[in-house]
Amino acid sequence: MSQFKSKEEAAESGVYIRKIQSFVKREGRLTKGQEKAIESNWETMGLEHKSGLLDMNEVFGRTAPVVLEIGFGMGKSLVTMAKNEPDKDFIGIEVHRPGIGACLADAQEQGVTNLRVYEHDAVEVLADCIADGSLSRMQLFFPDPWHKKRHHKRRIVQPEFVEKLRGKLAIGGVFHMATDWENYAEHMLEIMAVAPGYKNLSSTSDYVPRPEQRPLTKFEQRGHRLGHGVWDLMFERVA
């Protein structure tokens, strides 16, 4: 790629540069309930990457702080947070269709209306659809740890990613991460400690106790019983 200044420039010359992805798309089968939830709710709750830059006020029909979560899994925690914080608007991004269906089914059942979802690559959504300075909180909970050393480059938390994310957060906005993989927690801390424009909200300059706003998952509860740790990190955009 050295002869090109960007992937876009390479593409214009007919050269394709393979992008390192932080996820592996595992398609799993949709249940009938998940399929029905997508059919019933996508028109009102689904967002399309191809539509480009979002007008948050138009999407949600009001002006409110916006929280974005990358990789919400089956969506239980995201729906719970949206229900518990009705004064905020939530956007979730997930690449696995069964998770999209489960999230929409749960949102419908809970009567949650302040939630929208993308079925797309989060890095592309951030770049093309989220306006600079528009997010009050960014959430990344239990991302794939890519625990083998040779795969660490696939971890989503990298200097380039957190710098791009900083531009999307409002001044005073918070990037909240959580992982149950200690080595990844250390990796996150190492990256964020030197990332410009961020301030660690930990009084000990490392991790924070789980904030009340992040629901305790069944997976975590089981982990606690087995003595497994979970690490939360919160960094505020200050510049």
UniProtKB/Swiss-Prot annotation:
Pathway annotation: tRNA modification; N(7)-methylguanine-tRNA biosynthesis
UniProt keyword annotations, A-Z: Methyltransferase, S-adenosyl-L-methionine, Transferase, tRNA processing
Amino-acid positions noted as binding substrate in the UniProt annotation, renumbered to this chain: 148, 180, 217-220
Record GO cellular component, one term: tRNA methyltransferase complex
A Pfam short name: Methyltransf_4
Superkingdom assignment: Bacteria
Catalytic activity: guanosine(46) in tRNA + S-adenosyl-L-methionine = N(7)-methylguanosine(46) in tRNA + S-adenosyl-L-homocysteine
Gene3D superfamilies, sorted: Vaccinia Virus protein VP39
EC number, as in UniProt: 2.1.1.33
Residue positions binding S-adenosyl-L-methionine: 69, 94, 121, 144
Active-site residues, record numbering mapped to chain: 144
GO molecular function: tRNA (guanine(46)-N7)-methyltransferase activity
EC class (word): transferase
InterPro entries tied to this protein: SAM-dependent_MTases_sf, tRNA_(Gua-N-7)_MeTrfase_Trmb, tRNA_methyltr_TrmB_bact
Family affiliation: Belongs to the class I-like SAM-binding methyltransferase superfamily. TrmB family.
Protein purpose: Catalyzes the formation of N(7)-methylguanine at position 46 (m7G46) in tRNA.
PANTHER family per the UniProt record, alphabetical: 3-DEOXY-D-MANNO-OCTULOSONIC-ACID TRANSFERASE/TRNA GUANINE-N 7 - -METHYLTRANSFERASE, PENTACOTRIPEPTIDE-REPEAT REGION OF PRORP DOMAIN-CONTAINING PROTEIN
Record-given protein name: tRNA (guanine-N(7)-)-methyltransferase
Organism: Pseudoalteromonas atlantica (strain T6c / ATCC BAA-1087)
